[in-house]
Swiss-Prot record:
CDD domains: DRE_TIM_HOA
Record-listed E.C. numbers: 4.1.3.39
Name of the protein this chain belongs to: 4-hydroxy-2-oxovalerate aldolase
Keywords, ordered alphabetically: Aromatic hydrocarbons catabolism, Lyase, Manganese, Metal-binding
UniProt GO MF annotations: 2-isopropylmalate synthase activity; 4-hydroxy-2-oxovalerate aldolase activity; manganese ion binding
InterPro entries recorded: 2-IPM_HCS-like (IPR050073), 4OH_2_O-val_aldolase (IPR017629), Aldolase_TIM (IPR013785), DmpG_comm (IPR012425), DRE_TIM_HOA (IPR035685), PYR_CT (IPR000891)
Annotated site (Transition state stabilizer): 12
Single GO BP term: catabolic process
Catalytic activity reported: (S)-4-hydroxy-2-oxopentanoate = acetaldehyde + pyruvate
Binding of substrate, residues: 12-13, 166, 194
Amino acid sequence: MKQVVIHDPTLRDGQHAVHHRLGLTELRRYAEAADAARVPVVEVGHGNGLGASSLQVGLAAATDDAMLSTVREALRHSRLGTFMLPGWGTSDDLRRAISHGVDVFRVGVHATEASLAEHHLGFLRDAGAEAHCVLMMSHMASPGELAEQAARAVGYGAQAVGIMDSAGHFLPPDVTARIGAIVEAVGTVPVIFHGHNNLGMAVANSVAAAEAGARIIDGCARGFGAGAGNTQLEVLVPVLERSGFATGIDLYALLDAADLAERELMPAPPVPASMSIVSGLAGVFSGFKHRVVELAGAAGVDPREVFFELGRRQAIAGQEDLIVDVVAELSGRGPKTDAA
């Protein structure tokens, strides 16, 4: 059987679903359960990564230092991972994370902007740390563009590269084409896939990624994450095993960890609700959902139309101001712009 490495961002990406408010006890208990299941990598942090706790995107319940040290102490078999976005995280944040014993660093950038990771990947390379680079909102770039960006990231020092289906927009053939192109471009460098479940395709897309050559696959307990959630880890693992890929994970212990996560980490497991389906079809960042619904409701505009217009404009995270413009235009209170 071919080996795949499972990367579990339950304690980082899942934070988006609870406004980044997971406490240290919750982090420790899930980390211990994932470790008992022999999950290879357990990622922890604010949902937006190192240095991101703020009024702008949400204050975490604990500091980065406290989260990393708590989970580090809980892990005996699993490796400790963390995440950062250039613009939030800094070299100082990376340096402190190294001091806490982080084993795997992920640097996330927009699908066409690998150059933004150059400084941080170089810093981690020079520090002797394992650094990965993930290209987010990857449906907004062609297979060839993603392959080119991934190759650049490897040149900057990434020891694994891959894509995040941040909007949950892909179907399996989309994943096959993109992962295949990246694998061809980077050779023996491991390729990563991180799915979202807006269209209910996260597990199928992850299997397609593995079959196309991805060797690092992400999944969260109960799919814990914003909107429709991420790839459901305890479903992903046995499906991969049935598909001929070895994970090295203890299934019963993994199911126990998922049960614990449902009881202690989340108010309810995520599902592909109507707005999540629409945002996935439109190819729009799931984090826009609450703001779209709020502004559209106040203006008497159908939020589904707002999502599809944002998709036509290729809105990305950080462009929340576009929501205001689109709602105003659809309600007849604003002029049409050239971007429409």
